[in-house]
Design a protein with these regions (language model features):
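Ser/Thr-rich, low-complexity intrinsically disordered terminal regions
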Residues: 1-121
């Protein structure tokens, strides 16, 4: 991990990210099922759901340590890409956003049928 990431308070996933654990994850699921899984995951992490936009596939949630946004993009009817943006509130940032995203993906990998990482870069 690059030095600049150790002091960053915000992290975002993408297909082309240079950190392997922050690359987009793809799942074999319908959009409604993926949205439901992300909402349930957020509730399990004791987050408050701020907004759910099913048309755009965006879910915004937060708790006392971070704000997060999940974007669910349909690459086909039964394949979804899920990306996260996490902004943390820690006084001494030591890449906590990266750890939060890794926890999110580990839960979703068990909940949804995992297809792959960064499939369409």
């Amino acid at each position: 991990m690059k030095f600049k990431y150790y002091f960053s308070k915000d992290f975002q996933t993408s297909d082309n990210h240079d950190i392997e654990t922050l690359k987009t994850h793809y799942y074999h699921a319908r959009k409604e099922v993926a949205i439901e899984a992300v909402v349930q995951m957020a509730k399990d992490f004791k987050c408050k759901i701020k907004s759910i936009d099913e048309e755009r596939g965006e879910i915004i949630f937060d708790n006392v340590n971070y704000n997060a946004s999940a974007t669910i993009t349909a690459t086909s009817y039964t394949e979804m890409a899920i990306d996260f943006i996490v902004l943390t509130f820690n006084f001494l940032p030591t890449a906590p956003g990266k750890k939060v995203i890794e926890k999110f993906y580990s839960v979703l990998d068990k909940t949804l049928q995992f297809k792959g990482i960064s499939l369409y870069k």
